[in-house]
Amino acid sequence: MSTNPYSAEELNKRLDRVNGWINNCDQKSGILLAFGGAFVAVLLTSDVIGKGYYYLIEPFYSFWLDGVDATFSLKRATLFCGLLPTIYYGLNMVYNLLLVLKPKTKIEDFNDDSSPITNNSKLHFQSIAKKSYREFQIESKVQTESAYLDDLCTQIYCNSKICDDKFENYKKGLDDFTKTLICCFGEIVIYFIFPAHPTNPVE
């Protein structure tokens, strides 16, 4: 026996699947943000930032602004240059992951005038909240089955667009996260593997 693809049961299953993907993306983004927050917390509670400033930033700062003589090395210059993309990719990661968690709830945002989007939805929470309880109750009672199915289709479409945007931003955030780790690993390798300049008193 074939299943009607435009039945309330089938459409509700599709909506549940899309909502499941949205929750999955939100959870992944939350995990990455939590990991990034924990990493920053470790840096703030240790002396890494202080040592990094003293070793990388302070000599350039003193030389450029105060005219203080400073001895530079290839190692220090390389670490300083590597710090810039690390910060850039880290901030970009946070930005993209926050876009994942940013709510996008207005049905009007998805109406491109090419499809019959149901703006006066009986399922969408914002459309319901704009009405009084009595208005919502009356409109729900007189809603036809065809209108209800169209309303379900609208929710599936809008949630699918939301889900697609979320995963696009999540992929960007994950890519920035990977680049940040690579930059951090490169900084660690350069700092511990390459010898310090013998004539540099700071090193």
Show where each model-derived region lies.
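Short, charged/polar, low-complexity loop and linker segments
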Residues: M1-D16, Q137-E145
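Membrane-proximal soluble regions of multi-pass membrane proteins
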Residues: L101-K161
